[in-house]
C-alpha cells in the first residue's frame, strides 16, 4: 500500500469499545446533558416563540392546502390527496406521548431523529416529511418542524372537509435525539414472551411503556402479537390509549376518525423493502425502506403490510367507518403481503382504488378496527357515534386536539390565532392574575412573617420543593403554580407527608389571610407564591446560619387553582415513585435508586452539577421524607453548609451495606468502628461514581462554601420557576 492510501487513523473519536461496553450497569449521566447550546445551531438570542408570532399562519396553511393535492411523481398521493398520509404523520408524531413520565409526543420534532424516524410503524413518513421540505424551507425559522408536522395534520383534516377544534404553535425544535426508554427488546417488533419482553403475568405492560411492541406507536393492528382476535386486541387498545391519557370515548373517536381517511399499504411481501433510514446508504439522503416491488411506490407501496381502505370516501370526512363496521359481517383474510386483515362478507365493491378509477374493492378492516364493534364498552360508544354523526365529529375534533397538544403543557405556552377559547380540564388550568402583585417591600415583610411563625427551615424548604418538583420538562406539567399541593391528590401523596404538610399549609394560609386582609388596594399574595416565598426564606435563613448573606430571587405571579380545575386522575401520574432529592422510594424497584434520581433530575431539566448541589443542600436542610437521617452528613442540620460533600469524601469513614438489598449503608469511623452516618444508594453514588465524585470534590473543598451556597440558590431558583412560562 502506498503512503498516499494509508490512513493514519484506524479509528476516530467516539469509536471503539466504550465505557458502556465495559460496564453496562454504570450510571448514565448523559441524559442530563442533552439538548444543550452545543447542539443548537440557532443564535443564542433566538426566541422561537417570538419568531412564530411573526409567521403568516394563513399563508402557511394556504401552501399546505395546495400541497395536499399536488401529487409528486417520486411519491404519488393515494386517491390524488396526501391527506391520509399527513394525518398519519401528525398522529405518529404526537402519539409517542405517554403519561407515566410525560416523554414522547410532538414537542421537539423528534420524528426526524432515530430511533423514531426508523421505527417500523413510521415506514413512509420519511416521504411525508420530505414532501413538506419546500414549505419548511420557505418559512425557515418562523415555524419549527415540530409545529409544522402537527399543523400539516390539521390542514389535512380541514382539506378533507373536517372542522378541527383548533391549533396552537409553540413547539421549539430539538437538534438531537431524546434519550428515552422505549423498551429492552433487541429486535424490531419482537413478540412478547421472550427474555426482553415488556409483558409479565397476564399481559401486564411494563411501565412507563405505552406500546405493545418495539417500534410501534400503540398496538399491533393485526392483533396481540399478530393474533387476529378483536376482543383480545381491545385489551391492548385500552391499555395503550389510557397510557396516553385517552379514555374509551376518546379512543373510539380517534381510531374511527383517523381511519375515515386514506389507506394502509401492503402491496407485496415485506422482503422487498430495503433498510430503514438510519441503516440506508448515504445516497438515499435520509430516506429509507426503498422497495423493489414493482415501482416501489403508488399502487406498489408496502408500508405496514396491510392493504385496507376503510371508507368509500377516503379523502372526505364521513360516517362511513361506522356504517361499514356495523353493516357487514367480517371474515378473516390476508393482504397481498400476508398480513391478517378482514373483508366484508357478501359485500359489493364500493371502495375506490387509490390509483385506478375503474376499479372498486370490497370494504376491509383491521383487527383493531373490529375491536370497536366486538368489545362491549367500545361497541356502545361506536353505535352512539354511528347514530349521532355530529357528536362523533365533536368527539374526534376534541380528541385530535388533545392528542396533538397533550405534551405542550399549560395554555400559557399556546401561540397563534387558532388557539381555542375553551379551557379544558386536561390542560391543568390556572386562573389568570386578577389583582395587583406584591412588591419587594411586601416580599421582605412576608419572609419575616413566615420565619416568625416558628416553622423550621426543613418545613419551609420541604414544602416548597414538594410543590415545585412535580414539574416535568417532558410534558411541561406540574410545578408550583396553582398550589395544587393543597388539593387532591397531591395533598395525600405519601411523599408529601400529609399530616406534616397540612400543618405547614395551615400556617402559611394564616400568613396569607392576614396579609390579604390588611390590604386596601386589592393587592394579594397567592398561596402558590407564598409557598415558594417561604421556601426562599428558609434557604436564606439556612445560608445565614452558615455565615453567608444571600437573597433568593423571587418573582410573584403564581395563582391558586381550585379542586374543580384539577383532574385528580390525570394529576395522579405526577406522583413520584422516587425522589432522590428527598431520599424517597415508594417501594423497592428493579431500577437502582441512583438511576431513578437521574431520571427525576432529567425531568426537572437539571444538569449533573445542578443535581449534585441540590442533593447536597437538601440533605443538610433536612428535606428527607419522614425526617430520615440517611445522607444527613452534618451535625448542624438547617445550615446550608457543604458538610454533605466534605463528610462523604472523608477517608476516615468506611462504608458497608447493612441491608440485604444493598440499599442502606453505614459509615463507620475507621479508627473506632463507631457509626458516624447512614446513607442510601442515592447518597453514596456521589462518592462512588467517578463523574459525580469529581463534582462532589468541587463542593467538598475547603474553599467551596460560598460557591456551594451560590450554586444551590441558582439551582433552587431554577426548579421553583420551571413552570413560569410567563417569565420567559
UniProtKB/Swiss-Prot annotation:
Chain residue numbers at which the record places covalent cross-link Tryptophyl-tyrosyl-methioninium (Trp-Tyr) (with M-244): 91-218
A GO CC term attached to the entry: cytosol
Cofactor binding comment, as recorded: Binds 1 heme b (iron(II)-protoporphyrin IX) group per dimer.
Reaction it catalyzes: H2O2 + AH2 = A + 2 H2O; 2 H2O2 = O2 + 2 H2O
Keyword vocabulary terms for this entry: Heme, Hydrogen peroxide, Iron, Metal-binding, Oxidoreductase, Peroxidase
Cross-link Tryptophyl-tyrosyl-methioninium (Tyr-Met) (with W-91): where in chain: 218-244
Site residues by UniProt (Transition state stabilizer): 88
EC numbers, comma separated: 1.11.1.21
Cofactor (UniProt): heme b
Keyword Oxidoreductase on entry: yes
Active site per UniProt: 92
Post-translational modification, as annotated: Formation of the three residue Trp-Tyr-Met cross-link is important for the catalase, but not the peroxidase activity of the enzyme.
NCBIfam families listed in its UniProt record: cat_per_HPI, PRK15061.1
Protein known as: Catalase-peroxidase 1
Phylogenetic placement of the source organism: Bacteria, Pseudomonadati, Pseudomonadota, Betaproteobacteria, Burkholderiales
UniProt gene name: katG1
Amino acid at each position: 500500500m502506498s503512503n498516499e492510501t494509508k490512513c493514519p487513523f484506524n479509528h476516530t473519536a467516539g469509536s471503539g469499545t466504550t465505557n458502556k461496553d465495559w460496564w453496562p450497569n454504570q450510571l448514565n449521566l448523559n441524559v442530563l446533558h442533552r439538548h444543550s447550546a452545543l447542539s443548537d445551531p440557532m443564535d443564542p438570542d433566538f426566541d422561537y416563540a417570538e419568531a412564530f408570532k411573526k409567521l403568516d399562519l394563513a399563508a402557511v396553511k394556504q401552501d399546505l392546502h395546495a400541497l395536499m393535492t399536488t401529487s409528486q411523481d417520486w411519491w404519488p398521493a393515494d386517491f390524488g390527496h396526501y391527506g391520509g398520509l399527513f394525518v398519519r404523520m401528525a398522529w405518529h408524531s404526537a402519539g409517542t406521548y405517554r403519561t407515566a413520565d410525560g416523554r414522547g409526543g410532538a414537542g421537539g420534532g423528534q420524528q426526524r431523529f432515530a430511533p423514531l424516524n426508523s421505527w417500523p410503524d413510521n415506514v413512509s413518513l420519511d416521504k411525508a416529511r420530505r414532501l413538506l421540505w419546500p414549505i419548511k424551507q420557505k418559512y425557515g425559522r418562523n415555524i419549527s418542524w415540530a409545529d409544522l408536522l402537527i399543523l400539516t395534520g390539521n390542514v389535512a383534516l380541514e382539506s378533507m372537509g373536517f372542522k378541527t377544534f383548533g391549533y396552537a404553535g409553540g413547539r421549539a425544535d430539538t437538534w438531537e435525539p431524546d434519550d428515552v426508554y422505549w423498551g429492552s427488546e433487541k429486535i424490531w417488533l419482537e413478540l412478547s414472551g421472550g427474555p426482553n419482553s415488556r409483558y409479565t403475568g397476564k399481559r401486564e405492560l411494563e411501565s412507563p411503556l405505552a406500546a405493545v411492541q418495539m417500534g410501534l406507536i400503540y398496538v399491533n393492528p393485526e392483533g396481540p402479537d399478530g393474533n387476529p382476535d378483536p376482543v383480545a386486541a381491545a385489551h391492548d387498545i385500552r391499555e395503550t390509549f389510557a397510557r396516553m391519557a385517552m379514555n374509551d370515548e376518546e379512543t373510539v373517536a380517534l381510531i374511527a376518525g383517523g381511519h375515515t381517511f386514506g389507506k394502509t399499504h401492503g402491496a407485496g411481501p415485506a422482503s422487498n423493502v430495503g433498510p430503514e433510514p438510519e441503516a440506508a446508504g448515504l445516497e438515499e439522503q435520509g430516506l429509507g425502506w426503498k422497495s423493489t416491488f414493482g415501482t416501489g411506490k403508488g399502487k406498489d407501496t408496502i408500508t405496514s403490510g396491510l392493504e385496507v381502505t376503510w371508507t368509500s370516501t377516503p379523502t372526505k370526512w364521513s360516517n362511513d367507518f361506522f356504517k361499514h363496521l356495523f353493516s357487514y359481517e367480517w371474515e378473516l383474510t390476508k393482504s397481498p403481503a400476508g398480513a391478517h386483515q378482514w373483508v366484508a362478507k357478501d359485500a359489493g365493491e364500493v371502495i375506490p382504488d387509490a390509483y385506478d378509477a375503474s376499479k372498486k374493492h370490497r370494504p376491509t378492516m383491521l383487527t383493531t378496527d373490529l375491536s370497536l364493534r366486538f368489545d362491549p364498552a367500545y361497541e356502545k360508544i361506536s353505535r352512539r357515534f354511528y347514530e349521532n354523526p355530529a357528536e362523533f365529529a365533536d368527539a374526534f375534533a376534541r380528541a385530535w386536539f388533545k392528542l396533538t397538544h397533550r405534551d405542550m403543557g399549560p395554555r400559557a405556552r399556546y401561540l397563534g390565532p387558532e388557539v381555542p377559547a375553551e379551557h379544558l380540564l386536561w390542560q391543568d388550568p390556572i386562573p389568570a392574575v386578577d389583582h395587583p402583585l406584591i412588591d419587594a417591600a411586601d416580599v421582605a415583610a412576608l419572609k419575616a412573617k413566615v420565619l416568625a411563625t416558628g416553622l423550621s427551615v426543613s418545613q419551609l424548604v420541604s414544602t416548597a420543593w414538594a410543590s415545585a418538583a412535580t414539574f416535568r420538562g417532558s410534558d411541561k406539567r406540574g410545578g408550583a403554580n396553582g398550589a395544587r399541593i393543597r388539593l387532591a391528590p397531591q395533598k395525600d401523596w405519601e411523599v408529601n407527608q400529609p399530616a406534616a404538610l397540612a400543618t405547614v399549609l395551615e400556617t402559611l394560609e394564616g400568613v396569607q389571610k392576614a396579609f390579604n386582609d390588611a390590604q386596601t388596594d386589592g393587592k394579594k399574595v397567592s398561596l402558590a407564591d407564598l409557598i415558594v416565598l417561604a421556601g426562599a426564606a428558609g434557604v436564606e435563613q439556612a445560608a445565614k446560619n452558615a455565615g453567608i448573606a444571600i437573597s433568593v430571587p423571587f418573582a410573584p405571579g403564581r395563582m391558586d387553582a381550585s379542586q374543580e380545575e384539577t383532574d385528580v386522575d390525570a394529576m395522579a401520574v405526577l406522583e413520584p415513585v422516587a425522589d432522590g432529592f428527598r431520599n424517597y422510594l415508594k417501594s423497592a424497584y428493579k431500577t437502582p435508586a441512583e438511576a431513578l434520581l437521574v431520571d427525576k433530575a432529567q425531568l426537572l431539566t437539571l444538569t449533573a452539577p445542578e443535581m449534585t448541589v441540590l442533593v447536597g443542600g437538601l440533605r443538610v436542610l433536612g428535606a428527607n421524607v419522614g425526617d430520615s437521617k440517611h445522607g444527613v452528613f452534618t451535625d448542624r442540620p438547617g445550615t446550608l453548609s457543604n458538610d454533605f460533600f466534605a463528610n462523604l469524601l472523608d477517608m476516615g469513614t468506611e462504608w458497608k451495606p447493612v441491608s440485604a438489598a444493598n440499599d442502606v449503608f453505614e459509615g463507620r469511623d475507621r479508627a473506632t468502628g463507631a457509626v458516624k452516618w447512614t446513607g442510601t444508594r442515592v447518597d453514596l453514588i456521589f462518592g462512588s461514581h467517578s463523574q459525580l465524585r469529581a463534582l462532589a470534590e468541587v463542593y467538598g473543598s475547603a474553599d467551596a462554601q460560598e460557591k456551594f451556597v451560590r450554586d444551590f440558590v441558582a439551582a433552587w431558583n431554577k426548579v421553583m420557576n420551571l413552570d413560569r412560562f410567563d417569565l420567559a
